[in-house]
Amino acid sequence: MLCAVYKSSRKADTYLFVNKRDCFDDVPQALLDMFGVPQLVMVFPIAKRESLGIADIQKVRAALEEKGFYLQIPPPQVNLLAEHRVSLGIKD
């Protein structure tokens, strides 16, 4: 099975995986509206891959089979200053 990956034109580090290039039939319209104009990043055979950057390959495969798409959002940013302040016992 081929997988097409698109990056969001509105949200940084947000990617949409779909089963077929330029086929967004299974993606909810509300998600596409939030995502903006999809920009193709790559197309690859997902069956031959063992890993995918920060995405869990098993979750991507399962989502593609069940829903027809997978949305990868960036992990939350860590506020190092806030963590350091807490470690020092400083409260806001």
UniProtKB/Swiss-Prot annotation:
Residues 1-85 form the YcgL domain. InterPro entries: YcgL-like_sf (IPR038068), YcgL_dom (IPR027354). It comes from the Bacteria. SUPFAM superfamilies: YcgL-like. Transmembrane segments: none annotated. Coiled coil: none annotated. PANTHER family: PROTEIN YCGL. This is YcgL domain-containing protein Shewmr4_2172.
